[in-house]
Amino acid sequence: MKNKKIIIIGAGLLQVPAIQIAQDMGLYAIVFDYNKDAHGMKIADLPMVVSTRDVDGSVRAARDLSKQMEINGVITVGTDASTTVAAVANALGLPGNRFEDAYA
């Protein structure tokens, strides 16, 4: 049973290994991407159609999810979505870079 839940921002080919590794570690992979047909969306435990560049939309989606389940982390790999990750982490009280630092 997958207890801990992680949001992975992005579902392209570069994020697929991160999604797979998270799942191999027993994590429940919630994946945000604007493309519902992206490779990572097909293997996500919970795919969510949200643009990686839509910081406010990603924060709203993450906050909504956090009312239904505990979110334990948020990451991205191989993308320029560090500001989105920072904003989501900050909004949910998770460890991460400050938005100002990610934006710099």
Each model region followed by its residue ranges:
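ATP-binding N-terminal substructure of ATP-dependent carboxylate-amine bond-forming enzymes
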Residues: 1-103
